[in-house]
Each structure stands twice: as C-alpha cells, then as structure tokens.
C-alpha cells in the first residue's frame, strides 16, 4: 500500500484532520529561503509535532545552510524525520542520520547519479518539482516517466511529490509506483490551510491506487 504524507500543516486542526484521514506522515516547514504561507516558526513546529499521535510520523521540511544547522533544527523541533532540500554530500547525510533522526533528501528526478550516491545512507529519497531556488513546493507536476525510471534504478524507498491532487494521485501511483506520495498545496483551501475533504479524498485515493496498479497489470497480461 502506498504511504501518504501531508505536508505544510500549520495548526492542530489540520494536524487532527491529517491523522483522521489515515495519512502515515505529516510535515511542517521551517527555515526555508522561499516565501511560502506554509512556513512556521521552529517553536510552532515543535508544538505541533509534540501533539502528533504516536503512529503518525512527523517530518520537518527545511533547507538548512549546513549540517550543523540541520542538527540544530532536529534537536530543537524534535521531528522523526528531516526532509532536506539542498546539495548535501552523502557523508554529511550519513553523519546526520547517525544522530537518530530519519533523513530524506530531495532529488531531481533526472539526477540518477545523485540518487544512487545518496541511497545507501538515507531512509528514503523524495522526488519533487524544484523551484529556481532548489526548493520544492511548486505545486507543479514533473516528468513521471523520469520518476519511474529513478524508482527502478535506486535501492531506496522513493516518495513522489510535486503537483499531486486527489484527482491525479491514482494516475501518479500507477505510473511511478513509488513507496509513498507527498502532498501540500494539492489539498489546500487556501495557502497554509488544509481542505479536510480534499485531505480525506487524497489519502483514500492514494491508499487504493496500488490496487489500481495491480488491476491494470492483470488487464495488460
């Protein structure tokens, strides 16, 4: 079954909605050099993660300028996982992971060499549509065929992000066959505010999409 992360949560009401919908992970955004209504202060992220139920994985999405910056964030906010935007070397990610926090770097779908280099030292790889600054969260899809090729080539779980919505997530899963999917703007009523009906619809579609893959393969066979 495809795992689901809902990202860019900013308050307890949306956190509860994500949990009630059956998502596997929730993300909050801190310390990013881009203008986004989803960014919240470290203290707020810490409060939200402390309020998360025990089986909902908390993910801090950030773009730190150094490994020390990332360590400080992990120590101060206390997430289960750090999702890192930026050009970090494999050795740096390995040392960060050794502190006990999960590490998920963001990689361009066309950069197979980097994905292969990082795969042995990270918990998963997230493929997103990058902005000019190198951050994700553009709300735009990318070449899913390239993402599918990356899934096949990399020995690590791959999480698909970028422009996903309740309307296209089944097709995305059927095409890419990722370990998980990640959504932010695709389930929002407005910037930084989740549409709870859309959250429920997205999670349900993503969770049943793997059956759609299996059914499709049987028809083709």
Swiss-Prot record:
It is an enzyme of class 5 (isomerase). One of its GO terms (molecular function) is phosphoribosylanthranilate isomerase activity. It catalyses: N-(5-phospho-beta-D-ribosyl)anthranilate = 1-(2-carboxyphenylamino)-1-deoxy-D-ribulose 5-phosphate. Keywords: Amino-acid biosynthesis, Aromatic amino acid biosynthesis, Isomerase, Tryptophan biosynthesis. Pathway: Amino-acid biosynthesis; L-tryptophan biosynthesis; L-tryptophan from chorismate: step 3/5. One of its GO terms (biological process) is L-tryptophan biosynthetic process. Gene3D superfamilies: Aldolase class I (3.20.20.70). Signal peptide: none annotated. Belongs to the TrpF family. This is N-(5'-phosphoribosyl)anthranilate isomerase. It comes from Haloferax volcanii (strain ATCC 29605 / DSM 3757 / JCM 8879 / NBRC 14742 / NCIMB 2012 / VKM B-1768 / DS2). The lineage of its organism: Archaea, Methanobacteriati, Methanobacteriota, Stenosarchaea group, Halobacteria.
């Amino acid at each position: 079954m495809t795992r689901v992360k809902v990202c860019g949560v900013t308050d307890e009401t949306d956190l509860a909605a994500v949990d009630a919908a059956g998502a596997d992970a929730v993300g909050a955004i801190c310390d990013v050099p881009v203008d986004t209504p989803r960014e919240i202060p470290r203290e707020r992220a810490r409060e939200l993660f402390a309020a998360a139920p025990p089986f909902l994985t908390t993910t801090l999405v950030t773009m730190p300028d150094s490994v020390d910056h990332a360590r400080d964030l992990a120590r101060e906010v206390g997430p289960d996982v750090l999702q890192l935007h930026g050009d970090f070397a494999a050795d740096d990610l390995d040392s960060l992971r050794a502190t006990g926090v999960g590490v998920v770097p963001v990689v361009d779908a066309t950069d197979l060499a980097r994905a292969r280099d990082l795969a042995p030292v990270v918990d998963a790889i997230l493929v997103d549509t990058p902005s000019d600054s190198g951050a994700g969260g553009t709300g735009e899809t990318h070449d899913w065929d390239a993402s599918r090729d990356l899934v096949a080539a990399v020995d690590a779980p791959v999480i698909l992000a970028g422009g996903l919505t309740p309307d296209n997530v089944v097709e995305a899963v059927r095409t890419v066959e990722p370990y998980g999917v990640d959504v932010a703007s695709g389930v929002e009523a407005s910037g930084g505010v989740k549409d709870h009906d859309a959250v429920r619809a997205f999670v349900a579609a993503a969770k049943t999409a793997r059956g759609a893959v299996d059914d499709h393969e049987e028809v083709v066979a």
